[in-house]
Amino acid sequence: MRINCLLAVLGLAAASPACAQNSGWEGETGVFITPMAYTAPSTATGFGLPIVGYHYLYGGKVLGDFQEISIAGGGFQRWEFGYTRAFHNQGSVPSLSPLWHNGYNIFHSKFNLLPENASKKAWVPAISIGFILRTQVHDVGAAILDKSVTNGDVYIVATKTITQSKMVPIILSGGVRGTNAELWGMGGNTPNFQERAFGAVGFVFKGPAHTAFILASEFSQQPRHPSELPTAIIPTTITYAIRFVPTPERKINFDFGVAQIAGQIAPGVNLQARAQVAAQVSYGF
């Protein structure tokens, strides 16, 4: 299998309709929790077929379980757009778990400003801007106030696949987002709009029988305090993940990971979510 197709299979190079697809936690093309500058596959003059995904996070006995179902598409080799519905099963700690409620809507879009290797320069990364809008959020601060709120992100991200190390290509991605959401809405809103950095690194490996794997790690800074909880401190989220692509002929991949979310966030308040298991699967038509 050609290395550029392998990278596209993993969602770590310019995606091709012939290769498998991937979606991140909120449905956008990415890893687990961070978007990448690549967009969903499409033609230069029209739209591509959709990518669908299922995403699961075991948040622990305090936070409960989070699930998301997503659909996304691309257009004109530059544009990506999609919708995701978030679902939640409440945890089992009476003093804290009622702060999380079932479900909200996620709308997202991304536009590629600069394609990777533009002007035939191998050092040029892909650069994109995007937004994520969440509605009907009723978690944490919103639950305290007993009302649903809206929050969102705007971001710029650069992604580069380094293929000079042909045996193990390296993927670097990073950017800055402005957000008024804590933990992508799972922690409700924040008191104001804040700038936060994020990034990811991945290493691509060929497996047996034309399979492929990517080992990756991500970080995403979080706003310091959720709304209505000024003494609570939310740490940077870190993930460790593996993506498995069973075959280049099938547009499907599987992700498994561990997320460091939050533990003791305030005196007497422990979310018990420092090593949470997550999984997702995405399929491109």
Where are these regions (language model features)?
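Outer-membrane beta-barrel "beta-signal"
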Residues: 106-113, 260, 270-285
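Repeated loop/turn-to-beta-strand initiation elements of outer-membrane beta-barrel proteins
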Residues: 51, 77-83, 115-120, 165-170, ...
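Cleavable N-terminal export/targeting peptides
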Residues: 1-28
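Outer-membrane beta-barrel translocator domains and adjoining extracellular loop/strand segments
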Residues: 93-98, 138-145, 183-190, 225-235, ...
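Transmembrane beta-barrel strands of outer-membrane/channel proteins
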Residues: 54-58, 83-87, 127-135, 172-178, ...
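Membrane-embedded beta-strands of outer-membrane beta-barrel proteins
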Residues: 69, 107-109, 156-158, 199-201, ...
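Detector for outer-membrane/organellar transmembrane beta-barrel domains
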Residues: 147-229, 237
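Transmembrane beta-barrel domains of Gram-negative outer membranes and organellar outer membranes
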Residues: 20-154, 159-164, 227-230, 282
